[in-house]
C-alpha cells in the first residue's frame, strides 16, 4: 500500500451539500434561505442572546452577589486517594502528592477529606484536614501535621 492509494472507509464520508445549482437540485435559487430578510443575507443572522427589540433575558434578571477576591481555593483529596497512591509509612506532603500525580498545581493549599478507608500509617503534612479524615489517619497509626 502506498500513500496515494489510501482511501477513507466506506460510508465514512459524505458529499457536501451543493447550493444554488438549479431548482431540480432541491437547494437551488434561494439555497434554503427563504426570501429576503436578515437571515437571507451574506453574514446575516443575529448574535446569540439577541431577542429583537425585547430586553434580553440576561439584562432582565437582577444582579446578585459578588466575587470574594480573598477566597481560598483548596485542592481537595480524600483518604482513599492516599490509600491507593502511597506506601505504608510514607510522608504525604506537597512534593510527594505532586510526584504521585494527585496534584498538578498548588492553589491555596491542600485539604484532606474522609471519604474511603485507610489501612496504611501515613504522616500527613497539609494545610487542612477534616475531622473524619484526621480520625481515620490516626486510627490507621499515622500522624496529622497541619501546616
Curated annotation (Swiss-Prot):
GO biological process, one term: translation
Compositionally skewed regions (Gly residues) per UniProt: 21-31, 42-52
Region (Disordered): 1-58
Any GO molecular function: structural constituent of ribosome
Pfam families: Ribosomal_L27A
Residue pairs linked by disulfide bridges in the UniProt entry: none
GO annotations of cellular component type: cytosolic large ribosomal subunit
Keyword entries, A-Z: Ribonucleoprotein, Ribosomal protein, RNA-binding, rRNA-binding
InterPro entries per the UniProt record, alphabetical: Ribosomal_uL15 (IPR030878), Ribosomal_uL15/eL18 (IPR021131), Ribosomal_uL15/eL18_sf (IPR036227), Ribosomal_uL15_bac-type (IPR005749), Ribosomal_uL15_CS (IPR001196)
Family, similarity comment: Belongs to the universal ribosomal protein uL15 family.
Subunit (UniProt): Part of the 50S ribosomal subunit.
Job description of the protein: Binds to the 23S rRNA.
Descriptive protein name: Large ribosomal subunit protein uL15
Lineage: Bacteria, Bacillati, Bacillota, Clostridia, Eubacteriales
Amino acid at each position: 500500500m502506498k500513500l496515494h492509494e489510501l482511501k477513507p472507509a466506506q460510508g465514512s464520508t459524505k458529499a457536501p451539500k451543493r447550493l444554488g445549482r438549479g431548482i431540480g437540485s432541491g437547494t437551488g435559487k434561494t439555497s434554503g434561505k427563504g426570501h429576503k430578510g436578515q437571515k437571507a443575507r451574506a453574514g446575516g443572522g443575529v448574535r446569540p442572546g439577541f431577542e429583537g427589540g425585547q430586553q434580553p433575558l440576561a439584562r432582565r434578571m437582577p444582579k446578585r452577589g459578588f466575587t470574594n477576591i480573598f477566597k481560598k481555593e483548596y485542592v481537595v483529596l480524600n483518604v482513599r486517594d492516599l490509600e491507593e497512591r502511597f506506601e505504608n509509612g510514607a510522608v504525604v506532603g506537597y512534593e510527594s502528592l505532586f510526584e504521585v500525580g494527585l496534584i498538578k498545581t498548588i492553589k491555596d493549599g491542600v485539604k484532606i477529606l474522609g471519604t474511603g478507608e485507610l489501612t496504611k500509617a501515613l504522616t500527613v503534612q497539609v494545610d487542612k484536614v477534616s475531622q473524619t479524615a484526621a480520625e481515620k489517619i490516626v486510627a490507621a497509626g499515622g500522624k496529622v501535621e497541619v501546616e
